[in-house]
Each structure stands twice: as C-alpha cells, then as structure tokens.
Amino acid sequence: RVAAVLCLAFPLEAPRRSGPPRSRLDELDAVTVPTLVVQGERDRFGIPPPATNRRVTIVPGDHGLKKDVTAVAQTVANWLRDLAI
C-alpha cells in the first residue's frame, strides 16, 4: 500500500527539440495519496501547481536542487513529520 509520494524535481514538461512540450500533469493529478513536490525556482522542466493532496514547495536553484540541499532536506523532513504515517 502506498501511503504518500515524494517528488524531488518532478519533470513536468521535458524540453523537446521540436513541437510543444508534453505535460506530465495528468500523472500527478492521478495520485490520490498525500504528495510533496520539491522543485527548484528555475527548473527548466516546469513547476506543477498545488492541488488537493499535493503540496508544492519551491526552493532556490534549478532542476538539480543542489543550491540549497538543506532547504530540500528540511522541507522533506517537515512534510514527513506532518504526515505521521
């Protein structure tokens, strides 16, 4: 049984060589358990919107999430504590 989903730098829209980017938002929208998405403020793959059961936290940096690893870790730790599963 899946209790929750953690997405670190979820690739919402992969850059393509031609044509419009294909969104993967439907994949996130299909998740029914609590979900945390941690995304860099300059992530070239896009930033998904928050939704029911989905928290989106923006941290400094890009898709690599390397600029502020402490912020990423603290965000995840706080979310896990709040879940209490």
What are these regions (language model features)?
Residues 75-83:
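C-terminal alpha-helix
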Residues 1-33:
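Primarily recognizes the serine-hydrolase "nucleophile elbow" in alpha/beta-hydrolase
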Residues 51-59:
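Active-site regions of enzymes building and remodeling cell-envelope glycoconjugates
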Residues 30-32, 37-39, 58:
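Short beta-strand/loop motif that positions the catalytic acidic residue
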Residues 39-40, 44-50, 66:
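Conserved alpha/beta-hydrolase "acid-adjacent" motif
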Residues 18-22, 48-49, 69-70:
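Conserved strand-to-helix beginnings and helix N-cap segments that scaffold or border functional pockets
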Residues 61-75:
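Catalytic histidine-centered segment of alpha/beta-hydrolase-like enzymes
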